[in-house]
UniProtKB/Swiss-Prot annotation:
Pathway: Amino-acid biosynthesis; L-cysteine biosynthesis; L-cysteine from L-serine: step 1/2
Enzyme Commission number(s) from the entry: 2.3.1.-, 2.3.1.46
Enzymatic class: transferase
Subunit field text: Homodimer.
Compartments where located: Cytoplasm
Protein name, per record: Serine O-succinyltransferase
Catalytic function, reaction form: succinyl-CoA + L-serine = O-succinyl-L-serine + CoA; L-homoserine + succinyl-CoA = O-succinyl-L-homoserine + CoA
Chain's role: Transfers a succinyl group from succinyl-CoA to L-serine, forming succinyl-L-serine. In vitro, also has homoserine succinyl transferase activity.
Keyword Acyltransferase: yes
One Pfam family named in its UniProt record: Abhydrolase_1
Binding locations of substrate: R214, D346
Example GO BP: cysteine biosynthetic process from serine
Species of provenance: Litchfieldella anticariensis (strain DSM 16096 / CECT 5854 / CIP 108499 / LMG 22089 / FP35)
Amino acid sequence: MPDARRFIELPGPVRMYRGGELPSVTIAYETWGELRGQGDNALLLFTGLSPSAHAASSMADPSPGWWEYMIGPGKPIDTERFFVIAINSLGSCFGSTGPASINPATGQPYRLDFPKLSVEDIVAAARGACRALGIDHVHTVAGASLGGMDALAYAVMYPGTYRDIISISAAAHATPFTIALRSIQREAVRADPAWAGGNYAPGEGPKDGMRVARQLGILTYRSAEEWLQRFDRERLEGSDDSANPFAMAFQVQSYMEANARKFADRFDANCYLYLSQAMDLFDMAEHGDGSLEAAVRRIDAKRALVAGVTTDWLFPLWQQRQVAELLEHAGVAVSYHELGSIQGHDAFLVDSERFAPMVAEFLAHSS
């Protein structure tokens, strides 16, 4: 299969934000466009929890990426203008070092010997990758969901190394609701006997637990209105299974099951647990001695795009307004958008009619 990934080895030991260290780190990434100068046209893109670095198609890998409508020649993130670097998160399972990677000290996967992961670790690894590529200053730091948290953390941690910020459907910290939700998802994984305390064989693991966790995630990534429009109460053909009183009866169940099985087959369970917890632990106020305002004052961006969706349960609009207001008070020129998509938190992935013009306009006015 085509593979556009490239890899950077960061020398160790790499100290982790909440303690522990890794002897070395590999970061997988993909790029589009041509780098100019010292990186003045570089756009650093962070991903959500589950995607790889394959954000868009390329000559090396023509398969569509997870943000295909957004990245490419003549698209909102125009690769004739920008050099786009998409980073596979530290802790993930698509090429970057994570719990599924081999621990050189043992010759076995790290599993739960992997140190506690934080958003700050993901960001520090991405910063190291940029510097290894000879890029000390990027034009824009961008991301959505976990990637938006990463972008905000990058802005706080490395002032003076970027010009603009794009934060979509993200937040300065997790809420009790999302912490509780992700805790239940992680519990579903750990309650599966196949998790085996994290010591399952490569390629194996708690498929049933991951499937349940993903179904719960899918439910919250979209909105009740969209579920109604897409599926209503449509039943499955031949769903009257007298031998199984709890057999699937509705189209929506079939959709969630198929999506969840696909995810469980491709994503490592321990990596999922670590990345999920990292989202819960993130709090920008830690970079301001407990004060969000003090933390955001470290950000020296010229401009920021902050956007959210009216139907997003996970990162509600009040959190987008909070980020926008904090940035404005810090002297950043903010372009703020509340988008009326019915597609919930995942709208940025699929609602090109709303998101593409917004991003295109913001970047068009960014010199």
